[in-house]
């Protein structure tokens, strides 16, 4: 085993384009499952309520209202769906 072989082992194949292609192929399954779950009816309705709240709060200059409850409802609905689907896609 020569010095060149050791360098290839430490840095990979040595071809930066090849390394970039390998990195681009990796997709986080959590992101994919979240996107799928956000399309479900329950999540769509929760997101609509969140967006309506955001519009209402943003249109007022002085308000004590925030959209914490709507945000938590949306995240809960999405994460409930994700919890049931994510572990099936993991190896």
UniProtKB/Swiss-Prot annotation:
Pfam families named among the record's database cross-references: UCR_hinge
Methyltransferase keyword on record: no
List of residues that carry N6-acetyllysine: 42, 85
Keywords (A to Z) from UniProt: Acetylation, Disulfide bond, Electron transport, Membrane, Mitochondrion, Mitochondrion inner membrane, Respiratory chain, Transit peptide, Transport
Predominant location category: mitochondrion
Cellular component aspect of the GO annotation: mitochondrial inner membrane; respiratory chain complex III
Cellular localisation: Mitochondrion inner membrane
A biological process term (GO) from this entry: mitochondrial electron transport, ubiquinol to cytochrome c
Region described as Disordered: spans on this chain: 1-30
Membrane topology summary: Peripheral membrane protein
Biased composition (Acidic residues): 17-27
Keyword set includes Disulfide bond: yes
Complex formation: Component of the ubiquinol-cytochrome c oxidoreductase (cytochrome b-c1 complex, complex III, CIII), a multisubunit enzyme composed of 11 subunits. The complex is composed of 3 respiratory subunits cytochrome b, cytochrome c1 and Rieske protein UQCRFS1, 2 core protein subunits UQCRC1/QCR1 and UQCRC2/QCR2, and 6 low-molecular weight protein subunits UQCRH/QCR6, UQCRB/QCR7, UQCRQ/QCR8, UQCR10/QCR9, UQCR11/QCR10 and subunit 9, the cleavage product of Rieske protein UQCRFS1.
Reported function: Component of the ubiquinol-cytochrome c oxidoreductase, a multisubunit transmembrane complex that is part of the mitochondrial electron transport chain which drives oxidative phosphorylation.
Protein name, per record: Cytochrome b-c1 complex subunit 6, mitochondrial
Organism: Bos taurus (Bovine)
UniProt lineage: Eukaryota, Metazoa, Chordata, Craniata, Vertebrata
Annotated gene: UQCRH
């Amino acid at each position: 085993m020569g010095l060149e072989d050791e360098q290839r082992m430490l840095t990979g194949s040595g071809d930066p384009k090849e390394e970039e292609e390998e990195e681009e192929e990796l997709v986080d399954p959590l992101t994919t499952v979240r996107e799928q779950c956000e399309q479900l009816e329950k999540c769509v309705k929760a997101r609509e309520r969140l967006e309506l709240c955001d519009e209402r709060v943003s249109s007022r200059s002085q308000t004590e209202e925030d959209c914490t409850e709507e945000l938590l409802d949306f995240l809960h609905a999405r994460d409930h769906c994700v919890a049931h689907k994510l572990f099936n896609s993991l190896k």
